[in-house]
Amino acid sequence: MSNVPAELKYSKEHEWLRKEAYGTYTVGITEHAQELLGDMVFVDLPEVGATVSAGDDCAVAESVKAASDIYAPVSGEIVAVNDALSDSPELVNSEPYAGGWIFKIKASDESELESLLDATAYEALLEDE
């Protein structure tokens, strides 16, 4: 069973979301997602300043097996990207919940968080897959 940190929120598409300060959230892909994808070779990051809607594909994780879209779990503005992934995409594999984060978003509608899963619900989703 994959590691599912209790303090995070999750999407059904296997993104995680961690609350930071001032309505900003860090986004990455879950340990389960990176296990399915395999070794990362490239991450196509979104543009800082881009405005996205919840569910928009805004990044791509490319692995030795496949390329997978990464979706915005909430609507808002991309305020930072993890530039370290340009040289070290494998951080998504080795540190999916830490150094392997993908982007930070300033949420425009925090009520959208209510549609995300908590750790218990995400674990149940994984059991059903």
Swiss-Prot record:
Q: What Gene3D superfamilies does the annotation carry?
A: 2.40.50.100
Q: Kindly state which keywords UniProt assigns to this record, in alphabetical order.
A: Lipoyl
Pfam entry (one): GCV_H
Q: Name one GO cellular component term.
A: cytosol
Cofactors that this protein relies on:
(R)-lipoate
Lineage top rank: taxon? Bacteria
At what positions is N6-lipoyllysine found?
65
PROSITE patterns given in the database record: BIOTINYL_LIPOYL, LIPOYL
How is the cofactor bound, in the record's words? Binds 1 lipoyl cofactor covalently.
- Database matches in InterPro entries: 2-oxoA_DH_lipoyl-BS (IPR003016), Biotin_lipoyl (IPR000089), GCV_H (IPR002930), GCV_H/Fam206 (IPR033753), GCV_H_sub (IPR017453), Single_hybrid_motif (IPR011053)
The job of this chain, per UniProt, is described as:
The glycine cleavage system catalyzes the degradation of glycine. The H protein shuttles the methylamine group of glycine from the P protein to the T protein.
Q: Which family does it belong to?
A: Belongs to the GcvH family.
Protein name in the entry: Glycine cleavage system H protein
What is the scientific name of the source organism? Escherichia coli O127:H6 (strain E2348/69 / EPEC)
What gene does this protein come from?
Answer: gcvH
